A protein has these predicted regions:
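Ubiquitin-like/PB1-type beta-grasp interaction modules and other compact soluble beta-rich domains
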Residues: 1-73
Length: 74
């Protein structure tokens, strides 16, 4: 994170998370190592964001992001 950039306080799966101002959902998921993974879904403030919109979906102070990863098991 750029030391001169403002930071946002958001929540990711109900846990506080600090993020650089101007961040997008894609940037957050990249930081979490999930941007290129299959089987990932994300919602911001209760609204599902289609994968095609991750790059353009800006995040704001106090946004609540829910990240879901599909898993297989047997």
């Amino acid at each position: 994170m750029n030391a001169g950039a403002a930071t946002l306080g958001i929540f990711v799966n109900d846990r506080p998370h600090a993020l650089a101002g101007g961040a997008t959902l894609m940037g957050l998921l990249g930081e979490l190592g999930l941007a290129d993974r299959r089987g990932v879904a994300a919602a911001v403030n209760g609204e599902v964001v289609p994968r095609a919109a991750w790059e353009s979906r800006a995040l704001a102070e106090k946004d609540r992001v829910l990240v879901i990863r599909a898993t297989q098991g047997g």
